[in-house]
């Protein structure tokens, strides 16, 4: 399925995005102050200490068989009623509401792209790992490539990586690390978390979504790349072609966060219809 007819999706959302969603953007992703800062910093300190090449490979092996649980997409959404993301400085309410906020923001700006609406609902479902006993530092937060030196825009980079053993490795501590120039992000080992898990889960269960959807899910938390432009030395032409979709998605992932919670019961039938269309039935997680 190809969805390349609109090469710059931002042209649509700049016109149609709600004013409430666009205001006060500078207040989001504040990693210098705020009531949740201590919790957020502690999560990233653990993440940046223990996310290594060896750790990520072990997690791929542990979860790659998708034998944790069998359930529908909507059952996974309901599970997120019990999760508050400890890496998020912006919200302190269950992640299930954020899923519907994101999806509805996309639906308003892109009414003709129902697959994109569903991506909004799906994007954080990999966080069910935190409800399966995984520590949040191995599930939530911004992602980054392992096996190479963290670049400047990684959150808390200068004060959280001191104890990461990979940074003592003569190869992994270089800018390219274990990668070839412009190898493509599909060939990069990203820090383990809900993005990579959900991407692989969708592939395993053969979701009938376009390539853009899989790409958004896999890299939506890779802020050092899609927001700050770092890690260009690893990117290829496909990454640059997909970047506008990830950036477009990010507007809704980030700027729809609000303490005004959606009426989930009213929205549920519409999204159940999308699930039935693109990823029906009981799935392997």
Curated annotation (Swiss-Prot):
One of its GO terms (biological process) is inositol catabolic process. It is an enzyme of class 1 (oxidoreductase). Its cofactor is Fe cation. It catalyses: myo-inositol + O2 = D-glucuronate + H2O + H(+). This is Inositol oxygenase. Disulfide bonds: none annotated. Fe cation 1 binds at residues 98, 123-124, 253. It comes from Bos taurus (Bovine). GO terms for molecular function: ferric iron binding; inositol oxygenase activity. Substrate binds at residues 29, 85-87, 127, 141-142, 220-221.
